[in-house]
Amino acid sequence: MTDPSDDFAGNLADIPGSPADGRHTLAVIGAVDPALLDLVDLALAGQDAVVIRAGLHFGADGEAGSSDTDDDLVRLVSHSSAEGFDDEPVRLDVPMPYTCPTCSLREVLAAVAQDRVAQEPGGTTVVLLPAAIELAHLLPGLAEELAGTGVRLAGAAHVLDATTALDELLEHRLLSAFPGDCRCTGAVHLTNLGYADVVLALGRDENPAGADLIEHLRPHDALLLPGLDAPLLEALTTLTHDAAASLSRIHPATTSAWGGPDEHGVWTLDLSASLPFHPERLRSLVVELAGQGLCARGCFWLPSRPGRVCTWEVAGGAVSVGDAGTWAEVPAAPSGAGDGVAGEPRCHLVVTGVGDEEMREQVRRAFSRILLRPEEMAQALAWIGVDDGLGDWFGQESQEG
């Protein structure tokens, strides 16, 4: 790949960072809405760090003046340093080394971090990620690349606005972060809220229900900051990112019902059972189980696919099911998370909504109705190897696991 170190870091050399205190510190901040990252960029200006804004630019966009080539690019821009906000930013465009935008971003950030540690061993760099980057796809690999390099991967933050949280999490709002992007805002928020070390929630006073919804979807061990006046840089730099712990919080088989305030109608259901779902009843009751205007995540198992972790997610009005490997491959649950035995098949869905008690009870009833009844378990072995009618959801090959 083209190494961004020479040009970009040479321009950054005169921008002061933190006093040397050992390893170089790298923190990352993500959001779905790029306008929130603009606010964070301004808030960090004048603090003891170099702030780099990363963006993804695609040759097919036809953006005027974006580049001298038609290449897909990772763009690095820095306005902010300990000296304040500079109206004449440092900018570097790096051709994407891969067709995968997140893979390309990871490699570029690793190269920048390597150069920053050589330039300022005890300094601090904060990267504002491109909008709608999924932290779980970026950071585990970045942590591996930085291991033993003199760079400490500090905290990872996700920023969102409570005034738009209900809409972006519970309604279907499509993204267009890159060509062919078919994700919705809710799915990215749900994953990043569970994965991040720090959650920065703006607009909490303007929309208490949105603020409570964020609380319900935030892990108990993730730090919640209430706005831009909070010490974001300090919070990030005092943490060291643990990718394994973050992944375990969002794994379908080890996620937890974190809950939160209920004064403004936000609720969370924690549905769990050792019995499997009945394949035919799951198909017929999927709409009732998904509900409307809800977020849900978790796992289930089927007598027709007894060795497979089946996944369940509802976000942004869309339902998705999938396969997360075998039960033997499930990671250790976070400390204090759930009461299931690691590797033991189970159904566990965490469902969050706002108001609408009838919808909450509908989901609870659907979950109970879909489960195999105890008397049906005697014939559960008869499902193995039989077409369960869900091949279009999971694929026929996963039925053999």
Where are these regions (language model features)?
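C-terminal accessory "lid"/substrate-recognition subdomains
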Residues: T2-N11, H57-D61, H158, T164-D167, ...
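Short, solvent-exposed amphipathic alpha-helical segments in soluble enzyme
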Residues: L42-Q47, L142-E144, E215-L217, V286-A290, ...
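Nucleotide-state-sensitive switch-loop elements of NTP-binding domains
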Residues: D3-D7, L12-I15, H24-G155, A162-E168, ...
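Short, conserved charged micro-motifs
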Residues: L36-D38, N207-A211, F277-R281, E357-R364
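Generic C-terminus detector
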Residues: G340-G401
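Short cationic amphipathic helices and targeting signals
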Residues: V127, V199-L200, W267-S272, R346-V354
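A structural signal for short secondary-structure junctions
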Residues: A20-D21, S304-R305, V341-P345
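A short, charged/proline- and glycine-enriched loop
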Residues: A20-L26, D262-G265
